[in-house]
Amino acid sequence: MTAAANGALLNLNDYDSFDGTHSWWNEKFVKNITLFGTDIYVIAGAINIWDDCSIEALIFNKDYIERHGCDDPYQMVFDGEWTIDNQRVLMKQCTADVNGDQEMDDADNWGASGIGIILYSGLYGLDTGITRMNEDGFPELTCTTEEHITKVQSYFNTVMNSDALYQQGINGEKTYYDMFTDGQSALMMANLTSLFGLRNMEDEYGILPLAKYNAEQLDYTGKNNSDFYTCYAVPKSCTDPDFALTALEVMSGYSVDTLDYNLHEILFASKLTRDRESRQVLKILQNTISFDWAYVGDWRGNLVSIYDLKAG
């Protein structure tokens, strides 16, 4: 988007050869990215795979939580009850000082494992974010609102301060990923790219959306990891924009029954998931694709660091 601000990208909506309402473009992404109600400088849809793979989720060890007598998280998801309070209950139930040394580290068992600014990622499940696109097509800060601050504090108190969350580099040097695959954490906070490395995992695993703020929250929400999210743009130096945009339209249109179908129906539905419930959750996750303008320029570095400070 810095390139767009510097005048290096074309506004796709200036050309009749592009139509952002076509079904092969990602509707939620288009809504989030359209500036002033008219300007689109990047686009993503069926032609992309990483928009789907970068969705953030919770991966859980089914065998682990069964051994600890936890309630079925799938059922909580489908009943609309997968909330941060219930996530905390599961995490606490699955945490144990295995060696009895009174110090929780990477030799023990944890309710969840993760790395990075977990608070920042988790709050998107609470139907909030740093920015929102308003009705006039202007991104506006929402992180200063009372609702956002209340939800951040709630996530911090409920999840981050649960004494059941293993944070790589803080509680130990073992990676959060190895903690999960070695059966030492019930949940792994990650994105769907993590599934590619779990095909040989001995324990059974499943997929959950980010937990909601409370049961009254209507939908499961979330975000994409923008470091993985790919999109297409047309540079201002392009000598034939209509040809380039027509090519993008055709390729994305044909990708619906080829690339996109194989990603969802072959790779995700059969090779990377192990149960019917995970496939149902993947449908839920597809609706959580979102773009936060906080990732643009210095907003991400400066604003996101605040959440890192809050997490201590």
Task: Please tell me what each predicted stretch does.
Residues 1-55, 208:
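Hinge/lid segment of periplasmic solute-binding proteins
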